[in-house]
Each structure stands twice: as structure tokens, then as C-alpha cells.
A protein has these predicted regions:
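Long, well-ordered early-domain segments
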Residues: 219, 246-320
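Short, structured active-site-proximal loop/turn typified by the sulfatase FGly-forming signature C/S-X-P-X-R
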Residues: 41-44, 205-261, 314-318
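Extended, compositionally biased non-globular segments that define protein topology
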Residues: 1-117
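Hydrophobic H-region at the start of alpha-helical membrane spans
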Residues: 9-13, 121-126, 148-154
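Active-site-proximal N-terminal segment of extracellular/periplasmic enzymes that hydrolyze or transfer
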Residues: 167-230, 237
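Alpha-helical transmembrane segments
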Residues: 20-24, 54-63, 126-139, 160-164
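Internal/C-terminal transmembrane anchor helices
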Residues: 143-166
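Transmembrane alpha-helix boundary signature
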Residues: 99-106, 164-172
Length: 320
């Protein structure tokens, strides 16, 4: 029975950790509604995909502790001593993930989403501190009913509170519909031309090294007679959201293309953005999530060439 009780604590801690990952997906995708029809499939996928692996990892930690410790631990089905430390690990790792994703995606999130994600990450960080305090308070002694109540309440609130802070489903701010513009007949008459050459994946380091080797003489003349500078990119660093932002002049949340594909859980609610640093692409590889390619219909903002055409400029687009 001892090993079954060790397993039960591992399953509980893994469930809490899977809940944190579900919260992170909800934070990055404010358009996902919070209702049982949406949350249950999402929690089920993360519980199966991550919960099973985390259960094995937590169980291995407990076994290692049993081997190395002087006193063999005989935990209860819900052990305050065990779960306080396992939840410290889970909440600490989850808070680090949330802060890393907040830093990585913060520039492409709208202010409301960014602020709510900040609050959620702070709440999980505070939960990790509480779990750590419980663990330190019960070194070498069993927990009582009060400790178990505090632990259970913190586990529930550490998942529920960030969801409440995230708020109900909210559509990101979209661009205003175009208004009719009266074009002067002489506006489009001009002898000047603008040509934009855009190469996918051609970083400035690659171009400059090729120019130095004499392989790009035409681009070398452009560099010699023009200006050259580095540009920061967006996250995720995928062609579709980056080029959509270039074409529309709007961030991904406003132009409708936030990643290369749209992900679906059990062919249900679409997920536009997956978090980084937690192997979420493996969910697609192993069939937990399905992919749907982005199309031109997903672009909610107007590209610059359409805007210029409305104002009388002659525009030609090749290879878009």
C-alpha cells in the first residue's frame, strides 16, 4: 500500500502541474471561452499528455528520496509532507514558464491580455512560496488537518485564481473597417517608384557574408548606396505571423494570424498560440492536437498594397 500511496501523491501533483499548463494556454489565447465544453477537452489532453509523464517523474523523485533518506517515508494518500514539496516544484516550474512566455510574447499581446497574464503569473509564484513554506514547516513531522486544509486550498486556488484573473473569453481588438476615400485624379500620377524585395529567412548576417564573398553584387550596390539596419522579429518566429505583420503593419493579435497554423483539441475550440519552453509541439507530433493551416481568409487586417490601391497607387505583388 505504501507504493500506491506514493503513486496517489504523484498523480495529484501531476494533475496540479497539468492545470498550470492549461492556464498558460488560456492566458495566451484570450478568445477561448471558459466553459465545461471547452475546458474539459483541453484539461483532458494536457492531463493525459503531461500528467502521465509528470506522474512518472514525481514518482521517481519519491523513490529516489526513499533510497537516499535515512528514514523511510510512509506517506498518506494525500501527504502534506510529500505534496508540499512536489507542488513547490510544480508551481515553481509553472511560474518560471509563465514569466518566460510573458517576456517572450509580451510585446505581441494587447495590454489587457498582458496585464492579466502578469497577474496570473504572480498568483502562481505566490502559490509556490506558500507550498515551500508548508514544506519547510513540516520537515521531519507529519501534517495535521489545518496543514492539509491549507495545502488543498492552495492547490485549488493556484489553478482557479489565474483562470479568474484571465477573465471570460474576449476577442482581441480588430482594425476598424476601411472607409471610402475620395481619390484626386492627379494623385496617382508620379514618376517615383518603390520596390520592396523581401526574402524569407535571409538574415542580415547571411546577406552581409555573401556580399563580402562577392556572391551578391546587385544587393552589394544597394547596401553601399542605401541604409542597413537590424530588425527585431516577433514571436513565434514563424513566417506566417511575421509576414502578416509586415504586410498589414499590425501585431498578430490585431491582424488575425498569430502562428503558422491553428491548433484544435479533439476538433473543437481553435488554439491560435501555444506556449514556448514546454514541448507543446510534441502534442501535434503525437496526435493530441490537430493542425489547420492559415489561409488568406484568416487575415483580418488589410495589407498595405490594398490600402495603396484604394488611394490611387499602382501596385504589383509577386509571390505573396
Amino acid at each position: 500500500m505504501r507504493y500506491l500511496r506514493m503513486l496517489s501523491n504523484s498523480v495529484i501533483a501531476a494533475g496540479v502541474a497539468s492545470g498550470y499548463l492549461t492556464v498558460l494556454v488560456l492566458q495566451l489565447n484570450p478568445s477561448i471561452s471558459i466553459d465545461p465544453a471547452t475546458l474539459l477537452p483541453l484539461a483532458l489532453v494536457f492531463g493525459v499528455a503531461y500528467g502521465a509523464n509528470l506522474t512518472v517523474a514525481f514518482y521517481a523523485l519519491i523513490v529516489m528520496r526513499q533510497i537516499l533518506a535515512v528514514e523511510v517515508l510512509s506517506p498518506g494518500w494525500l501527504s502534506v509532507r510529500l505534496l508540499s514539496w512536489l507542488c513547490t516544484i510544480a508551481a515553481g516550474a509553472a511560474s518560471a514558464l509563465m514569466w518566460l512566455n510573458f517576456r517572450g510574447f509580451g510585446d505581441v499581446l494587447d495590454p489587457i491580455t498582458r496585464d492579466r497574464m502578469f497577474v496570473g503569473a504572480a498568483l502562481v509564484t505566490a502559490s509556490a512560496v506558500i507550498f515551500l513554506g508548508l514544506g519547510l514547516a513540516h520537515l521531519g513531522r507529519r501534517g495535521g488537518r489545518i496543514s492539509a486544509a491549507i495545502l488543498s486550498t492552495t492547490m485549488v486556488l493556484s489553478v482557479a485564481a489565474p483562470i479568474v484573473a484571465r477573465g471570460p473569453a474576449r476577442q482581441p481588438p480588430l482594425p476598424m473597417p476601411p472607409t471610402a476615400t475620395v481619390i484626386d485624379g492627379g494623385t496617382s500620377a508620379s514618376d517615383s517608384h518603390i520596390r520592396m524585395l523581401m526574402f524569407d529567412g535571409a538574415s542580415l548576417e547571411v546577406i552581409l557574408s555573401s556580399v563580402a564573398a562577392g556572391r551578391l553584387p546587385n544587393i552589394a550596390r544597394i547596401i553601399d548606396k542605401g541604409s542597413v539596419l537590424h530588425l527585431a522579429t516577433l514571436r513565434p518566429t514563424q513566417a506566417e505571423p511575421v509576414w502578416s505583420s509586415i504586410a498589414t503593419g499590425r501585431y498578430p493579435m490585431s491582424n488575425g494570424v498569430r502562428s503558422a497554423v491553428v491548433y484544435r483539441v479533439l476538433d473543437g475550440t481553435p488554439i491560435q498560440l501555444l506556449p514556448d519552453y514546454c514541448f507543446t509541439q510534441a502534442l501535434v507530433t503525437f496526435g493530441f492536437l490537430s493542425e489547420q493551416q492559415q489561409t488568406a481568409a484568416d487575415l483580418l487586417a488589410r495589407p498595405i498594397w490594398n490600402i495603396l490601391s484604394d488611394r490611387g497607387a499602382s501596385v504589383g505583388v509577386i509571390g505573396w
